[in-house]
Amino acid sequence: MVNKNSPKTIDRIILGVDPGTNVMGYGLIAIKGTQLTLIQFGVIHLSKYTDHAIKLSKIFERISLLIEEYHPDEMAIEAPFFGSNVQSMLKLGRAQGVAIAAAISKQVPIFEYAPKKIKQSVTGSGNASKEQVAAMLSKILFFQEIPKLLDATDALGVAVCHYFQKGDVKKSKGGWNNFIKENPDKVKTVPAKISKKKTD
């Protein structure tokens, strides 16, 4: 597992966050040149807490712990989408705000991306499904088992989106087809399996 406390073998670490009030996803990737390496990804379970204030405190606590453990250089977070349920949107916005506050308290730069932008960056289509995003990420980051809760892969998608938006990889109008053609060593076909294991 990559760790910023180990000898300098990476350029930077990106923490991706998919905010939520019942399940919050997180994913960490390491960057070395143009090579992406998966560090860790998972979810923070919040549905067992009925008090919204407690949920927010748990989000702050867990994001802070992730930053302390992995020392990310940047945090990328998905922007809340606009829905018809005002109360749900308000709660989601609070969850995002608390995650951002945790990063600010640790002096980690924050970057925000819209859901469609993330899907476009990862798959080439802004209308891709969560399953399509997860499948593409499994090829980019070389993991075979896709977690049952796709909030984890959504968070990885935010981190990978940020990597591309920072200009680390030059992309032409060909999008992903062009990237795969120019970087065959970074993408290989790996059968993706849906894991039934409980995510911590």
From Swiss-Prot:
Compartment(s) where it occurs, according to its Swiss-Prot or TrEMBL record: Cytoplasm
Reactions performed catalytically: Endonucleolytic cleavage at a junction such as a reciprocal single-stranded crossover between two homologous DNA duplexes (Holliday junction)
Alphabetized UniProt keyword annotations: Cytoplasm, DNA damage, DNA recombination, DNA repair, DNA-binding, Endonuclease, Hydrolase, Magnesium, Metal-binding, Nuclease
Residue numbers binding Mg(2+) 1: 18, 151
The UniProt record lists the keyword Transport: no
EC number: 3.1.21.10
Biological processes annotated in GO: DNA recombination; DNA repair
Comment on bound cofactor: Binds 2 Mg(2+) ion per subunit.
Cofactor: Mg(2+)
DNA-binding keyword on record: yes
Pfam families on file: RuvC
Signal peptide span: none
Protein family: Belongs to the RuvC family.
Reported function: The RuvA-RuvB-RuvC complex processes Holliday junction (HJ) DNA during genetic recombination and DNA repair. Endonuclease that resolves HJ intermediates. Cleaves cruciform DNA by making single-stranded nicks across the HJ at symmetrical positions within the homologous arms, yielding a 5'-phosphate and a 3'-hydroxyl group; requires a central core of homology in the junction. The consensus cleavage sequence is 5'-(A/T)TT(C/G)-3'. Cleavage occurs on the 3'-side of the TT dinucleotide at the point of strand exchange.
NCBIfam families: ruvC
Name of protein: Crossover junction endodeoxyribonuclease RuvC
Provenance organism: Cytophaga hutchinsonii (strain ATCC 33406 / DSM 1761 / CIP 103989 / NBRC 15051 / NCIMB 9469 / D465)
